[in-house]
Structures are given as C-alpha cells and as structure tokens.
C-alpha cells in the first residue's frame, strides 16, 4: 500500500507526528535530536547548523523520497542471515513510515564502491540502478549524517562514553568532508 505521511509507529500502529514530505520530517528529527543534547556544546550547535544548511540544498531531492513501511534500524546486528540469504529482521521498535533512503542510512557506513553493496541493494530493490544513483548515494549519506546526531544522544543517555566519542569522530568526518 501507499502512505500519506512520514513518521514513527507506536505500539498501536498509529502514525505519530505525520509529515507530508520527508524534508519536514528530517527537520523535525534534527531539531528534536539537537534539543536532547547539550545546548551549550558549540560543536553540537555547529553540526546541527551544518545539517540544516545541507537540508536546504537537498530539500527538493529529499521530497522526492516516497514513503514506505520500514524496519527503521536496518543495521547488520539486526539482520538474520543463513548462507548469505536474509532470513529475518529483529528489533522492530523503530519501525515506521519512512523511505528506502532512510532505511539504508545505517548500512551506508558499510557500503562503498569497493564492496558494491549499495549498488547490489538497488539492483535487487529496483531491478536495476536508479537513473539518479549518485544523487541517492548523497541523500543516504546526508540522512546518515543527520541520524548520527540522534545516535549521539542515545550514547549520552545510555552512558556509552566510548561510542559517544567514536560518534563525535564520525560527526567530524561528515562536517569536514
């Protein structure tokens, strides 16, 4: 089926915070994640500001993203496989109506041109590489960069100091790329 809005699903499967386009959803997420972090941290403010500037450049492309039902935490640790065949997904607490680009944000750090993973995914998903493959890669990388802000908050709330520092390093890589 198709969906008219982007957002998270709660345990009653009602859409929370529906958005009519993906850039509005991302803007809301970035502000929510930023507000959960230390508002006096100049680096966090600089990173969130960079995300908002990038969002304004990518807004039209992001709004072409079509909403679909997504797992929401598509990371290797949540994918069950046997003999190179995906047999299941676990950890559905972040499921919602997003887009394929959102779904791939966590896997993008493992995807590169050398291993061909992203190309293989798109060929499997669409039957061929989309005509705007390079644009899709940029969008996925941007969504990953935005999601890192949320992950930083998770690290802080869970007291995971080591992963917090690793995440800040990844943020620096995005900020200076």
For the regions a language model picked out, list residue spans one by one:
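Helix-rich C-terminal or lid/interface subdomains of diverse kinases
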Residues: 27-31, 63, 105-177
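Short, solvent-exposed polar/charged micro-motifs at secondary-structure junctions
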Residues: 16-19, 79, 149-150
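A short, ordered amphipathic alpha-helix with a cationic face
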Residues: 20-24, 93-94, 140-141
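Generic alpha-helical secondary structure signal
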Residues: 21-28, 46, 50-53, 81, ...
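N-terminal hydrophobic alpha-helix used for membrane targeting or insertion
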Residues: 55, 60-62, 80, 92, ...
């Amino acid at each position: 089926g198709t969906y008219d809005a982007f957002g998270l699903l709660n345990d009653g499967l009602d859409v929370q915070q529906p958005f009519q386009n993906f850039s509005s959803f991302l803007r809301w997420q970035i502000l929510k994640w930023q507000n959960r972090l230390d508002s006096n941290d100049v680096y966090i403010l600089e990173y969130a500001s960079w995300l908002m500037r990038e969002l304004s450049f990518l807004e039209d492309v992001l709004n072409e993203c079509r909403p679909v039902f997504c797992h929401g935490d598509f990371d290797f640790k949540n994918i069950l496989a046997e003999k190179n065949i995906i047999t299941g997904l676990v950890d559905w607490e972040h499921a919602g109506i997003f887009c394929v680009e959102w779904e791939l944000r966590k896997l993008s750090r493992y995807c590169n041109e050398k291993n061909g993973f992203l190309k293989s995914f798109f060929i499997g998903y669409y039957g061929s590489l989309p005509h705007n493959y390079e644009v899709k890669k940029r969008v996925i990388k941007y969504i990953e960069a935005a999601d890192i802000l949320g992950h930083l908050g998770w690290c802080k709330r869970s007291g995971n100091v080591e992963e917090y520092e690793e995440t800040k390093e990844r943020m620096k890589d995005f900020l200076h790329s």
